[in-house]
C-alpha cells in the first residue's frame, strides 16, 4: 500500500494523471489480496490490502489502470492442468513468457472476469489486458474444449469478445496491450491479434513503443477512420512525448 501511494505522489509530481499497475502478472500471482475464491484455492493470491491506499489515490484524482495477464498464467497452468494450452501432442505449452492457458477454457474466462469485476469494485477505472494473444512460435496448438480446429485468431478474438461482453455492464473501461508487430501486420497470424477486430472491441489499444516507431504505429492504427487514434492509441514509452495520450515506463 505504501508503494502505491508513493507511486501516486510521483505521478502527480511529474504532471501525470494516471497510474498503470500490474495487478495480475504473467507468473499468475496477484498483486492484492483477492476475495475471488479461485485465487486462494490455487495459491496465487496476493497479501496486500489495497482498499485504503486506493481510496487515498482516488482522492488525488488519479486514474487507475490495472494490467491483467490473460493467456499467460504460469501458476494456474501448472496447478490446474486442465487450463493449460496444449500442443498437438497434448503436452502443456510453455516458453520464455511462462505457462500459457487455453483462451477457450471456461474456468480461465470466468476467473478473469471475476478478477476484473473485483478490481473495478476496488476503484480501478480501466483494465488493460496483457498477453491477449497466442505464442509466436509456429508450434501446432490444440484447444482442448473445441471440437473443430479454430485458428489462433479465432481463439484470441473469442476471448476478447467474451471479456468485453461480460464486463460491459460494470462501466469498467477495457483495453488491450498489443504488439507493435501485430499493428504492422507482422506475425498477426501467430499472435492471433487481429487488428481489424481488436480496436473495435476495446476502449483503447496500448503498445510498447519507442520514439523511433511510435508515429508509424499511430499512423497504421489510424488507417481505420472509425478509430480515434489521438485518444484511444496509448503508447508505453520510456520518455514522455510532447503531446497525446501515453504511459511512461520509467
Regions found by a protein language model. Give the residues of each.
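Active-site-adjacent "subsite" loops/lids of carbohydrate-active enzymes
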Residues: 1, 71-117
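The substrate-binding groove and active-site-proximal loops of carbohydrate-active enzymes
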Residues: 1, 34-46, 96-110, 147-151
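Aromatic- and glycine-enriched glycan-recognition loops and surfaces
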Residues: 2-13, 39-63, 154-158
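Catalytic domains of carbohydrate-active enzymes, especially glycoside hydrolases
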Residues: 3-29, 118-128, 198-206
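Glycine-rich, aromatic-flanked loop segments that form ligand/cofactor-binding clefts
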Residues: 18-20, 46-93
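Aromatic- and acidic-residue-enriched segments that line the glycan-binding/catalytic groove
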Residues: 32-41, 73-95, 137-147
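Aromatic-lined carbohydrate-recognition surfaces of secreted/lumenal glycan-active proteins
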Residues: 63-72, 128-129, 150-192, 227-240
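Substrate-binding cleft/loops of secretory-pathway carbohydrate-active enzymes
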Residues: 175-211, 247
